[in-house]
């Protein structure tokens, strides 16, 4: 949508070298001149006069040849050949015209630094100059003082890239806290600065509600709202109202009362949440997506046109002309199939598979996702192309978690994620209309609410009241349990599904056989040289992983059409690769230190429970959620690339390896505790209420015919 980002491109600097031959030739020419008949040596003083420059030149050459040279910087991870520009996904390129400061390091270190623990100083040994064989013997001269030899610089201490990322995250977090608004006037000023328009009517009531609930108010926390709503400034307000009212699953708000006809359990949970703030809401209709999968993918070209209109609408209207009240709406429509009074746009719902063909139309035309060919078969081993990850990585580790979840610059993900290969259900449209949902991909156009399981606080997603013991009392390093979801896996496509890939990477037997060359990996890759893993050098990767990993499927979620059908969670086409294990309640999992979180059919509903626990979440995801702008990667959680190529490197950093690589257990504990404390401060149910109230005030303004004149300006006139 709109702008583009730059790819990190590969460049090599030529190291300038002094050539001894050229300088020696100069010395020979000088000496030959001194021997010629035109310059006979009449007196010793004359001889000294000409010999001294020769010794001076030789001394300079000797000095220069012994200087330490800059270390060469190997390019261990980046590859060239991609476009120099990084196209952004349609849903992120118009993000309020402001950068996402939460997940980006303030100054990302260049991605072409030396690999971890590698011998990369690259300095050549000094070369002693030797006189040429035809150099004439010179008369004896007084001994000249020796030229000082510069000492070779000591090899710098290797800093692990994760240390750099954590340092950057700490700074980003402090910068974020510095933006806190402590008064209503400060909050309104921050709003105008970041959004380019006046706050919506009711902003003062929103602020009062937030302060009553002890909320930390930082304008950046609400970026996702404007990311979601801004394209709708390109639609007529009347169209927005009609499309919302005419949808089949709707929450209606009239005269401060919220209601819904649907008894679908997600609808009822969202209704319960909205009813807690209904007295502060204007009239509106809220259309809901009841599916796991998102449904709106408006072409990038259309979104760009809508965003152009949105940008033109950003004005700070004179205070005297501001409309301070929302309009009243007629009673909600009754959803009768025979009622044709509501003329809504035909959505032309699509069921195209693979879903990649739908999802990528939200990417810019020049993006790799649009330009690279689409896959037609998923039967072979997945293709892992680490070079596509370089825009969001630093030395192989995620440096921009927001960009990592975008896929427009990562065309290989079409064969590495179940949602792109074969979702459980596909029903998508190109038509932009106001549909609310709990999560979405980077190119989807839903308006995000906190997911139902976050509000409902069901124990299987939260772990209950027990958030785990103290770090020092935990019983094991890594645990993951889950069902083999991600989409509809079958005999010809399961190898690319993300959960299948991750579980295989934790199979010590598979790893050992792959290391020995006995059995090539079926659906994963051994780690590349970027990570310089000590266990891999020792050919003990499988043995090492077996010491700390407790990972397995509880159900293989087999294709329902396959024959013969198996019981107990087994599956005929994956049984030779996986054995099911007993499930563990989240409260039990919190007794482990590290909790990988892998996407299922959509986002992982356990993530908020993980953040609130005393354990450390290791998060890999393609899905956007309401809270993304509130979390700082490497400060509150550990981000992981969706290929999982950095997984072993992450674990080596935290756990160490025997005596050769030190661990960072204290760093892991600090991130876990910081994440827990932060979640308890900004991801509470009260914070969900505050977020939704702000969201719905903005939504009501966009659906009002007088929207460009509406706002809250009391701070400017008082």
What are these regions (language model features)?
Residues 65-68, 195, 199, 211-214, ...:
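Eukaryotic basic, amphipathic alpha-helical target segments in cytosolic regions
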Residues 41-42, 169-174, 185-189, 484-488, ...:
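Short interface patches used for recognition in eukaryotic signaling and trafficking proteins
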Residues 56-59, 183-190, 202, 497, ...:
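Acidic, Ser/Thr-rich intrinsically disordered and amphipathic helical segments
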Residues 2-89, 95:
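N-terminal signal-anchor transmembrane helix specifying type II single-pass membrane topology
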Residues 45-55, 63, 115-118, 122, ...:
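Secretory-pathway glycan-assembly enzymes, especially type II membrane glycosyltransferases
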Residues 85, 95-98, 103, 108, ...:
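Asparagine/serine/threonine-enriched low-complexity, disordered tracts
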Residues 583-716:
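Catalytic binding pocket for nucleotide-activated donors in carbohydrate/polymer assembly enzymes
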Residues 130-152:
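Compositionally biased, intrinsically disordered low-complexity segments enriched
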